[in-house]
């Protein structure tokens, strides 16, 4: 039965008028042999969008004595009000604030792991426990001040931990020791 259905389907023909046959190209493989007009892509860099000739070259950061750390480290040091707004953003996203400090290396270095990436050999010490249930940025800033008093020569960062997804969502340096 199946062979008779298969053979009858193989000999079936479709009658088309010449106008219909020329309208649509036969489909072979993954691409049609005759399709829409192809647009030619210009790889010339001068054809890219322009700002009207007002190009200004930006200065690159010096490579010596300008270590960069994490998020927001390319900005000037944050004021207390700016830190409070960052912590408020963290709390509004339902992330758990936590403070961490590092007394030796607050920047990327390769001691335990040689490949670049997120896990770059830095291990920070947690200041107390994560602040579950914290609703006020002032609480976090008070803990930051306590940590600064205890470890004045340490780098201190604030992280935001999403307890639902169980990932760290934000991390930024809140305090750098003198000379950095």
Swiss-Prot record:
Signal peptide: none annotated. Residues 1-56 form a transit peptide. InterPro entries: RuBisCO_ssu (IPR024681), RuBisCO_ssu_dom (IPR000894), RuBisCO_ssu_N (IPR024680), RuBisCO_ssu_sf (IPR036385). GO terms for biological process: photorespiration; reductive pentose-phosphate cycle. Its main location: plastid. Keywords: Calvin cycle, Carbon dioxide fixation, Chloroplast, Photorespiration, Photosynthesis, Plastid, Transit peptide. Disulfide bonds: none annotated. Pfam families: RbcS (PF12338), RuBisCO_small (PF00101). It is found in: Plastid, Chloroplast. Heterohexadecamer of 8 large and 8 small subunits. Belongs to the RuBisCO small chain family. RuBisCO catalyzes two reactions: the carboxylation of D-ribulose 1,5-bisphosphate, the primary event in carbon dioxide fixation, as well as the oxidative fragmentation of the pentose substrate. Both reactions occur simultaneously and in competition at the same active site. Although the small subunit is not catalytic it is essential for maximal activity. The basic functional RuBisCO is composed of a large chain homodimer in a 'head-to-tail' conformation. In form I RuBisCO this homodimer is arranged in a barrel-like tetramer with the small subunits forming a tetrameric 'cap' on each end of the 'barrel'. This is Ribulose bisphosphate carboxylase small subunit, chloroplastic 2. It comes from Spinacia oleracea (Spinach).
